[in-house]
């Protein structure tokens, strides 16, 4: 039997970047990605605020199921020096689906994507192995929490954000 496929897979897995140290406590890696109009938006432009960097995609069922929870948290905490930056891992031919999902799920905060799917520059920067995934960045650009979902999102925001 031909084991070239297995051999190739082993090589790919060996070359896959290993997650660096835990992101929490680190300075959030800087990135700039285009918004739907093509305007470049950088993470550092949110300095001075707490920002939830939310990695998702229109084709991701678990992301879409989590979106109402994120919308609720945004409504509850946006007045406490908090915002969200949505980073979509949609593909080039998926821009329309991305825009429809933003409208349908009522994601009213800033959205960006290079439409490069898993080839997006942010994937290795943040060691993203699956979505939905997020990091909470403090006003100085430091990651203070990650992978906040469900009740844990609101609970953590309530603890961390200024009253």
Task: Identify the function of each model-found stretch.
Residues 136-163:
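Thiol-/selenol-based redox modules, centered on thioredoxin-like
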């Amino acid at each position: 039997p031909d084991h070239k496929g297995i051999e190739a897979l082993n090589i790919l897995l060996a070359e896959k970047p290993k997650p660096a140290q835990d992101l929490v406590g680190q300075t959030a890696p800087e990135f700039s990605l285009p918004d739907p109009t093509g305007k470049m938006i950088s993470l550092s432009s949110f300095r001075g605020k707490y920002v939830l960097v939310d990695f998702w995609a229109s084709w991701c069922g678990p992301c879409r199921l989590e979106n109402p929870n994120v919308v609720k948290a945004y409504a509850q905490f946006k007045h406490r020096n908090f915002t969200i930056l949505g980073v979509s891992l949609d593909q080039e031919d998926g821009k329309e689906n991305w825009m429809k999902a933003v409208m349908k799920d009522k994601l009213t905060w800033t959205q960006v994507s290079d439409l490069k799917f898993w080839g997006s520059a942010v994937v290795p920067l943040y060691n993203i192995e699956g979505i939905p995934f997020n990091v909470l960045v403090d006003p100085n650009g430091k990651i203070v929490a990650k992978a906040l979902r469900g009740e844990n999102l609101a609970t953590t925001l309530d603890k961390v954000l200024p009253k």
